[in-house]
Amino acid sequence: MSEWKIRFGTAGTSDSFTAMGYKNSLDIPAYTEKMGLDAFEYQCGHGVRLGLDKARQMADDAAARGILFSVHAPYYISASSLDEEKRLNSVNYLLQSAALCRALGGRRVIFHSGSCGRQSREAALEKALDTLKRAQDALDEAGFAEITLCPETMGKIGQLGTLEEVLALCGVDRRITPCIDFGHLNARTLGGIRSKADYAAILDRIGEALGDERARQFHVHFSRIEYSKGGEKRHWTFAETQFGPEPQPLMELLAERGLAPVIICESAGTQAEDAKTMKRFFEVCLCTTSQSGLRPPAPLVGGAFGIKRKLHPAAKASPTRGGGIPKG
């Protein structure tokens, strides 16, 4: 799996996993392949509990089937906490997640940065930037330099995780890659993603801030999400069309621009089925783009989407830095 390509997969397993007779984590690669998908995000929201030996078994099976794992780190990471001990613990949770990710043959660890709490957004971001720098240093020192940290955009307004905050975090090191959760962004902006142009503005901003490679190979979470005045309230399925955002305009843009993210569906109970729907949307869009005579753009250089904006000063990279789980 040396060649990078667009992938579609799930966060955890759909209700259909057990309905189809699959029983435990060792069955995940077979199930993922059966559903026509080629990515899987192993959920460690409540702690890194999967044994490394079992993870290596899963990795061998996944590699044979062309499936790429990623890992979602524990939810209780708090890179922005006022409590320094919690911030240091967050570094350890990321190290544990990186060890599991490597055992699974994966490349990416996705994580939530934390909340603002009783401090300003600016102060919370400063702490998160420092924690992330410590985490990247710790990964390098522990021999996990190939594992990519992916801070996620968040759905609740009180959480650290606007698009700009995540892009600032990615400025800590050129390897750090954003996890853009479009459902979360739609929820925290109270329905701000209404059109293809809204998606395009987000993609443009990623390219403007991060340049070519990360703008092309970023990480995606997608689901329809109900929201209230505080932002995210509940994940739904693609069948609940009263909740946004719509997936098809995003698939059109990915095809037209030649982008290749890993797309992880987080629908409630139908994530595999809905991921397959997105894959079909994308394949149709890709075919339409080809038949129309349009060609996806060549790889972009940094800043090609527009004028470069100045990154948060604490997010400047060091010049020495490089570029529902089943039981058991």
Question: Residue ranges of each PLM-predicted region?
Answer:
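Conserved beta-strand positions in the central sheet of alpha/beta enzyme cores
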Residues: 41, 70, 110, 179, ...
